[in-house]
Amino acid sequence: MLRKVCGALLFLALTAAAGLGQQAGYLDVFVARVKPDKRAEFDSLDKKIVEANRRNNGDKWIALEVAYGEQNTVIFSSSRETFGDIEKSTAVFMGAVGKAYGAAGAAALFQQFSNTLESSRGELRQRRWDLSYNPPADLAAYAQVIAKSRWIRTVVVRVRPGHEAEFEAELKEINAAAQKSNMAGMRWVSQVVAGGSPGTYHIARLMTSLDELDHAPSMRSMLGDEGLEKFQKVNADTVAGVEYILYRVVPELSNVPDAITSLAPDFWNPKPQP
């Protein structure tokens, strides 16, 4: 993962998201906001880093590009079991790129990459499977979901301080109503624990196609009039703000495990553009 190391080059690595081969406890996320006139250079440099990392058995991540939201924003997300795994994975990543380019060459490559960015930030999110709808039953199911995902719709909810318990209780009620109505799909929840505002929840819907959004049931149909009224009141009391973001999965900038690649090799190993 590209960890931008301040000073010489602090690169919060091309770590990242929404899952990479294991049901980890954390998501290690690097958010890159690219200069509009540098996007082509960003992609070119990133592909070099991805290839060097892949060739030398480096880290694993999935890359996502904002389709609807703040444009020219790319995130790299990796699964981590523990905080200690963050350090280990960073060392693996830096070692892989260093092996390909040498210490000086890797530093120069990272500096060029950094120069294409308007800003960047790292964020650590804890998986909240207890708040998720239709979480994967096992690692095989997890890999199947990630392999088929092409889009991710994320609802970012910022909860007022001291109201987390109320919000989480309401979210569990919504999940129960969705289960009762046999709602298709899944909603995977994570909560920011470092690098962002406390009380921030990410509710991600992983999709094979955008038309899945056309068939999503309304809150009223799931909760009923009384349940919807309760939801609206809890929402007004507990939520400070909500943001909706639609991401596109970018396979050419990703490096997912073989267990995922093997399920959709044509997608995860795209042929270079002529």
Question: What is each of the regions a protein language model found here?
Answer:
Residues M1-K4:
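Positively charged n-region of N-terminal signal peptides that target proteins for export
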Residues G7-A16:
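Bacterial N-terminal signal peptides
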Residues L20-E229, V234-P274:
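Short S/T/G/P-rich N-terminal loop/turn motif that feeds into the first structured element of a domain
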